[in-house]
Curated annotation (Swiss-Prot):
SMART domains: RRM (SM00360). Homodimer. Interacts with TEX14. Residues 830-903 form the RRM domain. The lineage of its organism: Eukaryota, Metazoa, Chordata, Craniata, Vertebrata. The gene is RBM44. This is RNA-binding protein 44. Residues 23-34, 169-180 have a biased composition (Basic and acidic residues). GO terms for cellular component: catalytic step 2 spliceosome; cytoplasm; intercellular bridge. The modification Phosphoserine is found at residues 388, 391, 546, 726. The keyword Cytoplasm applies. Residues 1-36, 169-190, 296-318, 735-758, 939-964 are annotated as: Disordered. It comes from the Eukaryota. It comes from Homo sapiens (Human). It is found in: Cytoplasm. PROSITE patterns: RRM. InterPro entries: Nucleotide-bd_a/b_plait_sf, RBD_domain_sf, RRM_dom, TTC3/DZIP3/RBM44-like_helical.
Length: 1051
């Protein structure tokens, strides 16, 4: 079969496409041409010859049909486009109760306008063509077109369709038709021979519309019911295999009975590219391609027996509303109907309106359109055509571009794929010939009004959502009821029932689509992939386009694309999705910053609150220390001036609080600047007040040591006797002078010599404790501290109230008193000392060794580096024998040293033998009595640890009534107590042993310096270190003190 499309020009000459070439043709009927206009899912109106058979009877029937009598030349010298976003035009739905026959295409006589709303294109379902035409349908068609013949009336046909939710996508398969004879026999060729034809419309230069390749137009969506309305009557047009043309929102200007078309939301712009008057139609001008884009126009045909469906309002374009006014003169359409010819119309007005729609491709195969400015600031459209089939997707988007303030809309030019071996550029028109498998891509350069033809266009890709396969028979798919599933994605007008795709494969996105009945509502929500495709298409200029090829060997037109994109300006878009998306991104960027600011403010408040709490705690701490010091001063009945003490402590407190506040304010300012609290130095409290307290208390203690001794005695709760003493030292002496009848007489120690009374013999037992210390590691302690004269002042044995005796006087008195001690009292207790015991020696071992000497009591004492035992005997003779026999004996592998603590008439002081270099011993040797020396040592011992003697007061054993066991306990308790120097040093500063070592080393380094000066220098070093020497090594302290002594000596 061959099909010849005849296009009649002003001169009566026609051209037909045969074998891919445009040939001059003498039409059999110059007044008649068969033309079928249809629109696919993307609102492209196409020219097609859907019937398989075309014979000579077709021409005869055409001759018999009603001719278009009053076809004047269409004058489009001044086309006017009115654009309105807010225009709401009523629409009339044209319904067809029985779409069994083909519906003819009609052209309007008068002016009409098409408003375009701001909606977005939806997908369209496919509409098949039927190849049979009944005589009854022909009659109805004649009635229908008679109504349209009135010159003073314009009938608007509205196509409003709804696309089912992601159900149908249209994919076009190329088919090439060749004209072989004048009889217009049609032949469907293979998909490889199909071609794309791209045409372009211009505004102000077009006076007449012509179609360069009106052969085959792809079918539109199925299931549409069109209602033709006019002032006379409503006609229901039945179409068997024909088609119905419905123009969206056609308004009649100057007519009383104007057809109100419904408001719809999709828009396509009408473009007229060249201004060709009908008088000057010549051979070259017939090839000019004019595109009239009607976003609502659809040509539909339905198979016999199919149910009718209403076409509802659909949303086609998300952009502006464009009103296109076409001022035409008398136009009549002639219907040439044949038995086997389906709805082909010949329009004699020398104008062929080609309805097209730019296609928007699916998300993954998006075809981004381009914008090109015209010389007159007009935007125009190009579309994708093929010689045998024109395919487009089911939804598309048109962007706004303020190219012209009068239009106030934007259009984007899609990429054009043309399959042809000839891309002929004739002046400002494009000739596209068939008969070649070579594909070329042409772009209309509006600025130059010419078309660029690119080689190797076989790689040019056009991705579509819906496809039409002309190799299959559409009757095979739609001969049943429309209520049945219309899943097939292709509609064919040929006898071949196989579904063959253009790209020989089914797109992947189809496999996930759902099937839906054609009869059901085709309303569907705006798909996400449409939004994504819109985002891809509406990218700003200068960005490369991404077009996925459906062809195996596809090439991008990147270079041309970029050039065209650079030439185009996308400015002033009132509703740009990319801008909205960018605004959303900016908002997202701002949100985290706002949240961070709030979090930062909360953190700063929390840190300030924490700092304030710390500051208040430090203030409270300072105030508590101040109160504690003042209360202790008053409670201790200090003899110093309270005013001076208050001033000193008060000034220290105020200074400390001032420094604390300054640091607090500084830290607060830094926190306000954003510095974290953890990075700032802590608000530590300077220990000025503590240092002052330590120094001040040390000075007080140096003068009133007995007060602290009394406090120590009270803490031990060892006051078991009712001795009324005025001082702690008196109490201690009374505890040691227990009588045999447990009567606690008050000691009347006078500053004179003759009054030392009973109980002082007991000092002989107490000396053992001092000797035990010397046997231990405290030998240096005893000798270092015994030479300090000031230490004797604090422990004056004449501790009665008002005692003012000098130290030396007290020593002489004590010597005289000890000489008068009765010998009978000295024979009442015998103790021996066993030193050098190994750790494994137990009390049982000692008892086994000294059992023959009748030991009454054994006491073992341990220290860090020395272990010894005290043994009590009832008889002096036993004690003497034990000392002689057991001295030097080995116990558990280690020899021991045994010496008597007290043996009447033969007593020798172990301290005198071991520590003969003691300075204190020299003072006592003036009395030339070893016993007095021992008793002097005893007199120093209660001063050292008086609080423990009270607990052991009942352990003092006299030969008359108590055993030696009590004395041993007293020795033990005295030995285990820590030593305290006379000079007051806080407990946390230095222990006695370290202090002793420091004093000894300093005495060796500075033998010319007295002990008092050394102690004062050490005290000054401690004050310089805020009252504490903790953490400093002994060597460091010695060096610092020595340096201070040298400086003071030099000054």
């Amino acid at each position: 079969m061959q099909a010849t499309a005849v296009v009649e020009t002003a001169s009566g000459k026609g051209y037909h496409s045969n074998g891919g070439n445009l040939q001059k043709d003498k039409p059999s009927n110059p007044k008649k041409e068969n033309l079928l206009l249809s629109s696919n899912g993307c609102d492209e109106v196409k020219l097609t010859f859907p019937d398989d058979d075309w014979n000579s009877s077709t021409l005869e029937q055409r001759a018999n049909n009603k001719e278009i009598s009053n076809i004047d030349k269409m004058d489009l010298l001044e086309p006017f486009f009115s654009v309105s976003q807010d225009t709401n035009t009523e629409s009339t739905q044209f319904q067809s109760s029985e779409l069994e026959d083909s519906t003819d295409y009609a052209f309007l006589n008068k002016t009409y306008s098409i408003p375009y709303s701001e909606s977005k294109l939806k997908k369209e379902s496919l509409t098949p063509l039927s190849s049979e035409l009944d005589p009854e349908v022909q009659k109805k068609e004649e009635v229908f077109f008679n109504i349209l013949e009135h010159q003073d009336k314009t009938v608007g046909l509205e196509r409003i369709y709804n696309i089912s939710d992601a159900n149908y996508r249209e994919s076009a398969e190329d088919t090439q038709k060749h004209d072989t004879d004048e009889d217009s026999q049609q032949e469907y060729h293979s998909a490889e021979e199909q071609e794309y034809i791209s045409n372009h419309l211009s505004f102000d230069q077009t006076k007449a519309l012509d179609i360069s390749n009106p052969e085959v137009v792809e079918l539109g969506n199925s299931g549409y019911e069109v209602k033709c309305a006019s002032n006379v009557e409503d006609n229901r047009v039945n179409s068997g295999s024909g088609s119905i043309i419905s123009f969206d929102s056609l308004d009649v200007y100057g007519q009383e009975e104007s057809l109100h078309v419904s408001k719809f939301q999709n828009s396509v712009m009408l473009r007229e590219y060249h201004d060709l008057k009908h008088e000057k139609y010549k051979e070259q001008e017939t090839n000019s391609m004019y595109h009239t884009v009607f976003d609502g126009s659809v040509l539909r045909s339905n198979s016999p027996g199919n149910q009718e469906s209403q076409s509802k309002s659909g949303s086609l374009s998300p952009q502006k509303v464009l009103k296109m006014k076409i001022y035409t003169e008398n136009m009549k359409s002639q219907i040439n109907e044949g038995k086997d010819f389906c709805g082909n119309k010949i329009v004699e007005n020398k104008i062929l309106l080609h309805l097209e729609n730019p296609s928007t491709l699916p998300q993954d195969k998006a075809l981004e359109t381009l914008l090109q400015p015209c010389k007159d600031c007009q935007t125009s459209w190009t579309s994708v055509f093929d010689d045998s089939i024109i395919s487009a997707c089911g939804y598309y988007e048109s962007l706004q571009n303020t190219a012209d303030s009068a239009l106030d809309f934007s259009a984007m030019l899609p990429k054009i794929a043309v399959r042809d071996n000839q891309a002929i550029e004739d002046n400002t028109s494009l000739k596209v010939a068939h008969s070649s498998t070579t594909k070329k891509t042409c772009f209309h350069n509006i600025g130059e009004m010419c078309t660029k033809s690119l080689t190797d266009a076989a790689s040019c890709t056009v991705t579509i959502n819906q496809t039409v396969d002309v190799s299959t028979d559409f009757r095979a798919c739609f001969t049943t009821s429309r209520a049945t599933s219309a899943r097939p994605s292709v509609v064919s007008t040929s006898s071949n029932t196989e579904i063959t795709m253009m790209n020989k494969k089914r797109p992947d996105e189809w496999q996930n689509e759902k099937q839906k009945s054609v009869a059901c509502s085709t309303d569907w929500s705006y798909s996400e992939d449409c939004i994504d495709t819109q985002m891809a298409i509406t990218k700003g200029s200068g960005k490369s386009l991404s077009v996925d090829s459906l062809k195996p060997n596809g090439n991008f037109l990147n270079k041309d694309f970029l050039e065209l994109r650079k030439a185009c300006g996308i400015t002033d878009l009132k509703k740009h999705p990319e801008r909205e998306f960018q605004l959303f991104k900016d908002t997202e960027k701002d949100l985290p910053s706002m949240c961070c600011q709030k979090i930062m403010q909360r953190a700063i408040k929390a840190e300030l609150h924490l700092l304030n709490v710390h500051y208040q705690m430090c203030r409270r701490h300072c105030c508590d220390i101040y109160k504690l010091v003042m209360e202790n001063r008053e409670g201790l009945n200090m003899n110093l001036s309270s005013n001076s003490a208050k001033k000193e402590l008060g000034s220290a407190l105020l200074s400390l609080l001032g420094d604390l506040k300054v640091r607090y304010v500084t830290l607060k300012e830094k926190i306000h600047k954003g510095i974290p609290l953890e990075e700032l130095p802590p608000l530590s409290l300077e220990s000025k007040l503590l240092s002052t307290f330590s120094t001040f208390a040390s000075r007080l203690m140096k003068k009133e040591t007995h007060v602290f001794s009394e406090a120590d005695a009270e803490q031990d709760n060892q006051r078991a006797h009712d001795v009324d003493v005025s001082s702690n030292l008196k109490k201690t002496l009374s505890q040691m002078s227990l009588s045999s009848d447990n009567s606690h007489a008050t000691q009347n120690i006078s500053p004179k010599k003759d009054d030392f009374k009973n109980g002082d013999i007991n000092a002989d037992f107490s000396q053992l404790k001092l000797g035990d210390k010397d046997c231990r590691h405290y030998q240096e302690t005893s000798e270092d501290w015994s030479d300090a004269k000031e230490s004797l002042t604090g422990v004056d044995v004449s501790g009665t109230q008002g005692n003012q005796v000098e130290q030396d006087t007290w020593n002489l008195d004590l010597t005289g008193e000890m000489k008068n001690v009765e010998p009978s009292q000295r024979d009442k207790g015998y103790l021996i000392h066993v030193g050098g015991l190994c750790p494994s020696v137990s009390e049982a071992d000692l008892r086994s060794h000294f059992q023959k000497y009748q030991v009454s009591e054994i006491s073992i004492y341990d220290s860090t580096n020395y272990r010894y035992a005290s043994l009590a005997f009832t008889k002096n003779s036993d004690a003497k024998i034990a000392v002689k026999e057991m001295n030097g004996i080995e116990i558990n592998g280690k020899s021991v040293n045994v010496w008597p603590v007290k043996i009447l008439g033969e007593y020798t002081s172990p301290l005198s033998s071991k520590n003969g270099n003691r300075i204190s011993s020299n003072n006592l040797e003036k009395s030339t009595n070893k016993q007095i020396h021992s008793e002097f040592s005893i007199s120093r011992l209660p001063r050292t640890r008086p609080r423990q003697l009270g607990s052991e007061q009942d352990s003092e054993v006299f030969p008359s009534d108590q055993g030696v066991k009590k004395n041993c306990k007293q020795i033990e308790s005295a030995k285990l107590l820590p030593d305290t120097p006379v000079q007051f040093i806080p407990p946390n500063t230095l222990n006695l042993r370290s202090f002793t070592k420091i004093i000894k080393r300093l005495a060796e380094l500075h033998p010319e310096v007295s002990r008092d000066h050394i102690i004062n220098a050490l005290q000054e070093v401690r004050i310089r270190h805020k009252g504490f020497l903790n953490g400093l090594s002994i060597t460091t302290i010695v060096e610092m003190t020595s340096s201070l002594l040298k400086n003071s000596a030099s000054s």
